[in-house]
UniProtKB/Swiss-Prot annotation:
Coiled coil: none annotated. It comes from the Viruses. Plays a role in virus cell tropism, and may be required for efficient virus replication in macrophages. Induction: Expressed in the early phase of the viral replicative cycle. The keyword Ion transport does not apply. InterPro entries: MGF_505. Belongs to the asfivirus MGF 505 family. Keywords: Early protein. This is Protein MGF 505-10R.
Amino acid sequence: MFSLQELCRKNIYILPYSLGKHVLQHLGLYWEKHGSLQRIGDDYVLLQQDLIFSVNEALRMAAEEGNNEVVKLLLLWEGNLHYAIIGALEGNRYDLIHKYYDQIGDCHKILPLIQDPQIFEKCHELSTSCNIRCLLEHAVKHNMLSILQKHKDQIRLHLALIQVLFELACREHKNDIVRWIGYSLYIHHLETIFDVALLHKNLSLYVLGYELLMHKVNTEAANIDVSDLLTQHLRSAAAGGLLHFMLETLKYGGCVDKTVLFAAISYKHRKIVAHFIHQVPRKTVEELLLHAVQTRAPKKTLNLLLSSLNYSVHTIIKQLVRSVAIYRSTLVVKLLLMRRKKKLNLIDAVLARLVKYCTYTDIVKFIREFSVSPERVIKMAARESRTFLIEMISKAAWRNDPQTMIHHLKQLTYTMKPESGKDLLIYMIHYIYQTSNLLVAEEEKNIFKLATFYAKHNSVNRFKQICEDYYALDVDARFKTLILECFEIAVQKNYPRIASIVDDFIRFLFYKGDITKEEISEAYSLKNAELYVDLKWLQQE
């Protein structure tokens, strides 16, 4: 509960000029040796109707003088207790500190408000649970170099502490402290300064790092592989896209080799690649292009590398195709196709590798991206004996319609050169036939055509099976026509096994009475027919 007087003191903003010193003293609005106190707004006070101070500055002054009443008033006017503690420390008013100690909380929160190193250290001493390391760490954070200098001899005895303070100074970007530690103390791991500088893109800290590195090399006879270190820095700077950092490193030596430019490409920093690309040999540029493909670099980076090679990549076509297929990175294929001159079409080469090694999903994506016909892919799949691909692509391309699929696969068989590929296509045709329930009267014409197809391609077992299936449809006249037609095919193409199967079916039809001796004689009158069948059985009948 506030007294009426305290409520007035807290909220009164305008004082009558007629109030004398005695009245102001009774109201608690008089500051000895300074004059009347008047609140202005929320953050300022007017002293003796003339001087304006911030509430916190006035609070610091009052605490320094040990004026408890004014301190109490200014705290009532929402002054920050931390400034009272600072003032008390400046005036050695420990009685006042003791009075408010329980309200202070964490004394470390006061430290950022202090500029004087001595007061800073005295304030830190208020935290009885802290040690010298805590003081030094806060001295680094708040740029109190003189405190570090004061305790230099003590710091020097603890190498781990030196490293902690150095790393903290780097992270806090306190360059003056970093420089002092670098020149005055032994730093075990100097690399921290470069790590922090690169992480925060702090060029001034990075430059300071090299200053300290050269000092360390020249004064400590340190066993440091500077060349290797410079390459690491170049690689890290390239990965971060920090060209100015790379140029700074190059002042001390180092070389922008392919590993450095690999990093720039991996992290998509084209400008760095553009700056150095003309300094590396053609073979390195070729390797960079392959790396760009593998990391799926953007269009501008690929164009930069291709342009540097004058779009001539014939020496690395195999590696390029392999990289495109393995890393599913097809942009370079498009760029090479877009050229008016020196156009290079890698679609077939990439597609062949995809068909050989990659999944159906990858292949479909490529087909759609480059508008590749399904027939083209199926022929490649047949050469590589990838039955599953043939089936899946056929279903997707021709809407899983059996007759349409069979029709297109039959057409492909005629142009398929490797016999193994042709056999696989015929196998797929028969597989579709067997799994699609086509053995119905409505499909009679298509089965007839398929049987003649098997005969033309000397597919013996499948021909025999489909003839048996066709006979089961109970179309005797058409079956006779099929058999006679296929016999003619067998004789013309010199397929003795097909002719033998046909001969068996003809005998069967003859014994059933479905074909006459005259019809058989006419069929067997073909030139060289006697080479494929034995006509004695017919003569004996």
